[in-house]
UniProtKB/Swiss-Prot annotation:
Bias kind Low complexity: ranges: 28-47
Residue ranges, compositional bias (Basic and acidic residues): 18-27
Function: The glycine cleavage system catalyzes the degradation of glycine. The P protein binds the alpha-amino group of glycine through its pyridoxal phosphate cofactor; CO(2) is released and the remaining methylamine moiety is then transferred to the lipoamide cofactor of the H protein.
Induction: Induced more than 4-fold after exposure to light for 6 hours.
Predominant cellular place of this UniProt entry's protein: mitochondrion
Chain positions with N6-(pyridoxal phosphate)lysine modification: K792
Protein name as catalogued: Glycine dehydrogenase (decarboxylating), mitochondrial
Enzyme Commission number, as recorded: 1.4.4.2
Keywords on record: Mitochondrion, Oxidoreductase, Pyridoxal phosphate, Transit peptide
Enzymatic reactions: N(6)-[(R)-lipoyl]-L-lysyl-[glycine-cleavage complex H protein] + glycine + H(+) = N(6)-[(R)-S(8)-aminomethyldihydrolipoyl]-L-lysyl-[glycine-cleavage complex H protein] + CO2
Length: 1057
């Protein structure tokens, strides 16, 4: 055996020596042949060559070397020449560069695609597309200009994370630590099949998250005791402000005072005070005992239950008195508390708001979290935000959809109930799954444990001789002491954060992560160094209940089987994946929604979002404990200022619509500071996003609408006349650039000058910033303020309808007015001189801080050149698709040189006359091809707006174009009379398996063609799970909670009978 092994080794060695000798011989006699490598470094379309230039591989300044493969091979092992020339230092640098992973087109593809559009190079296409008058020479960063590699980025984020100090938080105030169930963390929060989905406008390919959001609504209605809920709002503070607006609308604006009880969270009070200005409402803050309605001018009142300092009060008589005076009652509440407390609906509350954060969503230094708003059926059409409803599909089977969309900004514009667009769908889904996982008994057990720990703590403090509030409480204990600050400082030394209410009052709020050991540590802190003769465990048997008997919940909740079935990890895992399989996401195919920028959400960008050093910080923790976050904020602010040409940024707005509102409020504050109280006119193009007029209305501005010319550009003459007519009262002009028509308007700098010459400020909607970065900038163009949709241009995923971020950048003269916060003072980044902040826009000082690392890592890894290239490739991809499709569909708008920006509009209006086909039919048929439809009928009715982004490969662009071309041929069959106008493959789309596999098939086309209209679908196909959903039926028969299990079964049986 040993002899055989030696012989085998000797033979191997002989062979290797022979090969080495032959290689040396080849090296000396040939300069044209190369030795193959175990990986490819050749071919102009290689992903590796495209990101590492030839000059890097051969050494800068050298002539091309056709022997790169062999030369590199000299250090790869036996069989390659060892005496070859040395490799360049550049080639030894890290290879995990990011731009080549994000920007999909290779250099060879870029050239060929540009040529197909009629240009020699990508740069010549961009030069013809972006007006020369607004082009930047270059963009350079102070930090990260060359871009970090993915590995370097992770190390940098680890360094930042190490600078955050996660102390045990007892601060409360609406933010609590929670155990995120790992099955939910891994399979929803970290799962691109959930976080890369878009808002479920296309219901047939969104049934999974629609069901989860319906679970969320059912959870909210059950716990609050009110019959209607929306599918999430941005945070508790803004939800309260929305409720205040509802009260104003319910009273038809006739009563102009809104009272807020002093037991509400300070951030909620501040947001309502800020928001009230736009509605000309007077906000009065009073102690509960001092509230009266003698003025007859009160539209509503807001109370907290439990109160911000922990008290649990009986609001029965209070609400009766309010109703007797025709005053609506808003109650801010806590979902975990409502599992054991009498629900607000049983008191008679009209509206209930709150946050679902402590249902399995980390604090994240402030967000994102899903807020909620529940109300009665009477006020359903005045509710803000998305609402999920039950309807039926074309076969009569139950199907879900977004209900009552006519309330929303994209339809009603300035008459909408709210400017809300992006909400917090991903976080609502996490919270709903938390309730599904724990069920009613599990939630009640958590609540009772939290209450018990708080009660044991209160008992212990009494034994230590401290004064504890004698009112009922749930999870927060209020303590009177001679020196609150000294106790808080002592707690910090033990890595504990408490809330200091005033010099003599301190509170401690408990949550599901609190342990008996934590309570013992608190005893030592409050004992001030004196020995403690008891433990939390020893006191436990003495505690009974601190909730007044009349306020203990008796009514059942979460009785539906969904909340009582999936309590093991296997069962919940399968339920999550069953829902996930019903939804199309970026995991399946491109989502070419115009003005939505559904680009890559890279894994490296997402990783830090789940690290405890980022997730577990309370937003009101001392900033000394969040130095990693603060460094990131400062770096990000500097990067965004460079990208936009602005002087300062606020990171507080936690949605694009919130950014619009904040920017307009900053403009308003600027005018007021100059004594221009009369400047309240806002000019808005008719083609603007619906959020623009809705936001302007919220600020109290009067809206003047101007039109566009035949080429889709803003009518400059009409704008000039409007600006001059209103020059004495002009406040702002809102503009999107490139335009919502997908064109770089040549006169944009002239437009800005017209507004400035007439005393107004220019607000730029940053929705299309993906076509500006590195090529031009809002500040360079002439804008005064702009919000950025970080969930578009800067890679925060859309999450199926949120989260998002809408930070605003401003010029120097507006910087002093950027938002602040009542608990942790904030302002612009970098900080302006002489700040005069306007108040809070969001509940947390830095908005949804937890998702800012996504945009931060994207910018830092791309570097200035990578970002510039991304903008160029986004333009290239759109023009390539427009060129491929122009022979089949008219491209509606183009720039002066015949090109489009990063998106374009195809015109389908003619097909209604020739074939009875509308954009909805095309969008539904695209589902059969495995695609999400483009943006329908906006900004022009009867059209589709397509935005490919820079992240999609040429192969994917071609696949989508092929689908649309194939659909055009299907339309032609109708036009020729070969297919029935009313019964054809487009009108019948989409075709779910339940329809295709039914016993009976009555369609005039084959099942095979309905299901597999393209060859690529046979390899892998995403299946719609329902037929076309009936929107009219859903609104006429409005049901916004889970149907009783028995009813659902009966309806499904009837539909299949």
């Amino acid at each position: 055996m040993e002899r055989a092994r030696r012989l085998a080794n000797r033979a191997t060695l002989k062979r290797l020596l022979s090969e080495a000798k032959q290689n040396r011989k080849t090296e000396s006699t040939s300069t044209t042949t190369t030795t193959p490598l175990p990986f490819s470094l050749s071919g102009s379309s290689s992903r590796y060559v495209s990101s590492v230039s030839n000059s890097i591989l051969r050494g800068r300044g050298s002539k091309p070397d056709n022997n790169v493969s062999r030369r590199v091979g000299g250090f790869l092992g036996v069989g390659y020449p060892s005496q070859s020339r040395s490799i360049s230092v550049e080639a030894l640098k890290p290879s995990d560069t990011f731009p080549r992973r994000h920007n999909s087109a290779t250099p060879d593809e870029q050239t060929k695609m540009a040529e197909s559009v009629g240009f020699d190079t990508l740069d010549s296409l961009v030069d013809a597309t972006v007006p020369k008058s607004i082009r930047l020479k270059e963009m350079k960063f102070n930090k990260f200009d060359g871009g970090l590699t993915e590995g370097q980025m992770i190390e940098h984020m680890k360094d930042l994370a190490s600078k955050n100090k996660v102390f045990k938080s007892f601060i409360g105030m609406g933010y609590y630590n929670t155990h995120v169930p790992p099955v939910i963390l891994r399979n929803i929060m970290e799962n691109p099949a959930w976080y890369t989905q878009y808002t479920p406008y296309q219901a047939e390919i969104s049934q999974g998250r629609l069901e989860s959001l319906l679970n969320f609504q059912t959870m909210i209605t059950d716990l609050t005791g009110l019959p209607m809920s929306n599918a999430s709002l941005l945070d508790e503070g803004t939800a309260a402000a929305e409720a205040m607006s509802m009260c104003n609308n319910i009273q038809k604006g006739k009563k102009k005072t809104f009272i807020i009880a002093s037991n509400c969270h300070p951030q909620t009070i501040d947001i309502c005070q800020t928001r009230a200005d736009g509605f000309e409402l007077k906000v009065v803050v009073k102690d509960l005992k001092d509230i009266d309605y003698k003025s007859g001018d009160v539209c509503g009142v807001l109370v907290q239950y439990p109160g911000t300092e922990g008290e649990v009060l009986d609001y029965g008589e209070f609400i009766k008195k309010a109703h007797a005076n025709e005053v609506k009652v808003v109650m801010a509440s806590d979902l975990l508390a409502l599992t054991v407390l009498k629900p607000p609906g049983e008191f008679g509350a009209d509206i209930v708001v709150g946050s679902a954060q402590r249902f399995g969503v980390p604090m994240g230094y402030g967000g994102p979290h899903a807020a909620f708003l529940a109300t009665s059926q009477e006020y359903k059409r005045m509710m803000p935000g998305r609402i999920i409803g039950v309807s039926v599909d074309s076969s009569g089977k139950q199907a879900l959809r977004m209900a009552m969309q006519t309330r929303e900004q994209h339809i009603r514009r300035d008459k909408a109930t709210s400017n809300i667009c992006t909400a917090q769908a991903l976080l609502a889904n996490m919270a709903a799954m938390y309730a599904v996982y724990h069920g009613p008994e599990g939630l009640k057990a958590i609540a009772q444990r939290v209450h018990g720990l708080a009660g044991v703590f209160a008992l212990g403090l009494k034994k230590l001789g401290l004064e504890v509030q004698d009112l009922g409480f749930f999870d927060t204990v209020k303590v009177k002491t001679s020196n609150a600050k000294a106790i808080a400082d002592a707690a910090i030394k033990s890595e504990i954060n408490l809330r200091v209410v005033d010099g003599n009052t301190i509170t401690a709020a408990f949550d599901e992560t609190t342990t008996l050991e934590d309570v013992d540590k608190l005893f030592k802190v409050f004992a001030g160094g004196k020995p403690v003769s008891f433990t939390a465990a020893s006191l436990a048997p003495e505690f009974q209940n601190a909730i007044p008997s009349g306020l203990v919940r008796e009514s059942p909740y979460l009785t539906h089987p969904i909340f009582n079935t999936y309590q093991t990890e296997h069962e919940l895992l399968r339920y999550i994946h069953r829902l996930q399989s019903k939804d199309l996401s970026l995991c399946h195919s491109m989502i070419p929604l115009g003005s939505c920028t559904m680009k890559l959400n890279a894994t490296t960008e997402m990783m830090p979002v789940t690290w405890p050093s980022f997730t577990d910080l309370h937003p009101f923790a001392p900033t000394e404990q969040a130095q990693g976050y603060q460094e990131m904020f400062n770096n990000l602010g500097d990067l965004l200022c460079t990208i936009t040409g602005f002087d300062s940024f606020s990171l507080q707005p936690n949605a694009g619509a919130a950014g619009e509102y904040a920017g307009l409020m900053v403009i308003r504050a600027y005018h007021l500071s100059r004594g221009d109280h009369h400047r309240n006119v806002c000019i808005i193009p008719a083609s603007a996003h619906g959020t623009n007029p809705a936001s302007a209305a919220m600020v109290g501005m009067k809206i003047v609408t101007i039109g566009t010319d035949a080429k889709g550009n803003i009518n400059i003459e009409e704008l000039k006349k409007a600006a001059e007519k209103h020059k004495d009262n002009l406040s702002a002009f809102m503009v999107t650039y490139p335009s919502t028509h997908g064109v770089y308007e040549e006169g944009i700098d002239d437009i800005c000058k017209i507004i400035h010459d007439n005393g107004g400020q220019v607000y730029m909607d940053g929705a299309n910033m993906n076509a500006q970065v590195g090529l031009t900038s809002p500040g360079w163009i002439g804008a005064d303020v702009c919000h950025l949709n970080l969930h578009k241009t800067f890679c925060i995923p859309h999450g199926g309808g949120g989260p998002g971020m809408g930070p605003i950048g401003v010029k120097k003269h507006l910087a002093p007015f950027l938002p602040s916060h009542p608990v942790v003072p904030t302002g612009g980044i970098p900080a302006p001189e002489n700040p005069q902040p306007l108040g809070s826009i969001s509940a947390a000082p830095w908005g949804s801080a937890l998702i800012l690392p996504i945009s931060y890592t994207y910018i830092a890894m791309m570097g200035s050149q990578g970002l510039t290239d991304a903008s160029k490739i986004a333009i290239l991809n759109a023009n390539y698709m427009a060129k491929r499709l122009e022979s089949y569909y008219p491209v509606l708008f183009r720039g002066v040189n015949g090109t489009v920006a990063h998106e374009f509009i195809i015109d389908l209006r003619g097909f209604k006359n020739t074939a009875g086909i509308e954009p909805e039919d095309v969008a539904k048929r695209l589902m059969d091809y495995g695609f999400h439809g483009p943006t329908m009928s906006w900004p022009v009715a009867g059209t589709l707006m397509i935005e490919p982004t820079e992240s999609e490969s040429k192969a994917e662009l071609d696949r989508f174009c092929d689908a649309l071309i194939s659909i055009r041929k299907e339309i032609a069959e109708v036009e020729k009379g070969n297919a029935d106008v009313h019964n054809n493959v487009l009108k019948g789309a989409p075709h779910p398996p339940s329809l295709l596999m039914a016993d009976a098939w009555t369609k005039p086309y084959s099942r095979e063609y309905a299901a597999f209209p393209a060859a690529w679908l046979r390899g892998a196909k995403f299946w719609p799970t329902t037929g076309r959903v009936d929107n009219v039926y859903g609104d006429r028969n409005l049901v916004c909670t889970l149907l009783p299990a028995s009813q659902a079964v009966e309806e499904q049986a009837a539909a299949t009978a």
